[in-house]
Amino acid sequence: MDLVALTYTSRSASGLTPRDVDLIHRAAITYNPLDGITGLLVYNGNGFMQIIEGAESAVDDLMSRITADIRHNELEVRDRRSQAERCFPHWSMYRVDVSPSFERGLSGVEDAVTQMIDASMRAVVVSSLAAISTPA
């Protein structure tokens, strides 16, 4: 199996509610195990940053569904890489809600996942959070 990790950012659609974000997360934790997907979902009130891990075909299929989802605007794939092993093997989709402020948002994500990602993935996370953050 070719294991890939894909990181994307998107702006949340206007009028997105906390319940909508809960529904996105619940769908991920329900369906991702069926497709062999694991990862991390970060929401900061402005947008999403997500790392999706799995077989290349499963990741591509999921990204097609996310791209078509009207709850996401300005979706941008920020990184795609082959991996020898998963960063988040036990998380069908771990969710971290953080502050819209870049500095506080980064701190929240680092607290949750710093031991699980390498330096190059950390750089992707930092630049991705910056893309969806508001000034401090």
Which residues are covered by each model-predicted region?
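Charge-rich, low-complexity N-terminal segments
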Residues: 1-136
